[in-house]
Regions:
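Short coil/linker segments at helix-helix boundaries
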Residues: 1-17, 32
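Structural motif corresponding to the intra-repeat A-B loop/turn of tetratricopeptide repeats
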Residues: 5, 40-41, 75, 118, ...
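Amphipathic alpha-helical segments of tetratricopeptide repeats
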Residues: 12-20, 52-56, 86-96, 129-136, ...
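Residue signature of alpha-solenoid helical repeat architecture, marking inter-repeat boundaries
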Residues: 24-26, 59, 102, 141, ...
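"A position-specific structural signal for the A-helix of alpha-solenoid helical repeats
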Residues: 32, 67, 103-110, 142-149, ...
């Protein structure tokens, strides 16, 4: 009747049209798609172009830089990610104290994710401790991913009881991120990839 289609695919397609063609809506649409593809749909390859465009157009937007960094790490571009982290460490110095309080745990999460990808699980756990202890952002999706990554790191180090605790902490957040489903899976069967 009103061309309303409540399907997920239809919604993603409509946001994609806005991201590609919107006069002003493209900014918010690309940010939304980046979040969805990184943390809900678990399709980081689909987030790369959106996050890259946001960073190219808004190079000083720290949050957009974090999204791009996440996409780089999760698509395996580790050498570029390491260099990008160095730039981010300089950029964070220019933020207000409140912005630092909010974004520094995100940056530590990204560093932990990179260490995990490099198979440095103990290094990842050290960085994740900072993220979890200092997390103050309203959106808890990154916190959920931090708990998930903490559990996966413990599983890789064969510390199953700590891994389960981390997975329970992730699930307890009860947000709509893909990390919740992964944590439920790894509660039943340890992460071993």
């Amino acid at each position: 009747f009103y061309d309303l289609n409540p399907s997920k695919d239809s919604g993603l397609q409509k946001i994609s049209v806005s991201a590609d063609r919107g006069t002003w809506s493209w900014i918010e649409s690309k940010a939304i798609l980046s979040n969805l593809y990184l943390w809900v749909e678990d399709e980081p390859i689909l987030a790369v172009d959106y996050t890259k465009s946001l960073v190219q157009n808004f190079p000083n937007n720290f949050y957009f830089n974090l999204l791009y960094l996440e996409a780089l790490i999760r698509t395996g571009d580790l050498s570029v990610s390491a260099k990008f982290i160095e730039k981010m460490e300089e950029k964070i110095k220019n933020l207000t104290e409140r912005q630092k309080e909010w974004f520094e745990p995100y940056l530590y999460y990204e560093k932990a994710l990179l260490e995990f990808q490099k198979l440095n699980f103990e290094g990842a756990l050290d960085l994740l401790s900072f993220t979890i202890e200092n997390y103050s952002a309203e959106l808890d999706i990154v916190l959920g991913n931090a708990f998930l990554l903490e559990g996966m790191s413990h599983d890789k180090l064969y510390n199953r009881s700590k891994a389960k605790e981390s997975y329970y902490n992730c699930i307890y957040l009860d947000n709509f991120s893909g990390s919740i489903n992964q944590a439920k899976l790894y509660l039943k069967k340890p992460y071993r990839n």
